[in-house]
Amino acid sequence: MTRDGAYDLFERELEAVRRRYGFVVAGYVLMPEHVHLLVGEPRRSPLSVALQVLKQQSSRKLKSSGEAQFWQRRYYDFNVHNGEKRVEKLRYMHRNPVQRGLVEKPEEWPWSSFQHYATGKIGTIEIESEWTARRREAETVQQLRLPPFARS
């Protein structure tokens, strides 16, 4: 499996685990040897359980495809309590591929939430942001405009 294929697989696994455990992903960046995640506490279990499942499922699938170990043994967490700190962490994460010399600009790194924040682009992973809130609001308004028998 190519590195791109491994990143794609991980994005699909992250979205599946996000849905299963009901947590918000505010941002992410996949790097060659680690992952940055900015997430909210899951509704259905502790974050440590959701991350353990994510690591196990993605590792098993990557290993079966011949990909080398992806995860570090431990994860490091940092609590974000306000919007200012959230923006700081997102900037740090999105700039990481640039700092490492992988790309010249954050928008050139395809395995991150940067494009979502820059353009509102919907990717594999649902990112919780103002773009997402506006899209949900527009979908709700559209549903309310439909005749009752046409609503799903």
Task: Give residue ranges: language-model regions.
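Short catalytic/metal-binding and nucleic-acid-binding patches
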Residues: 1-152
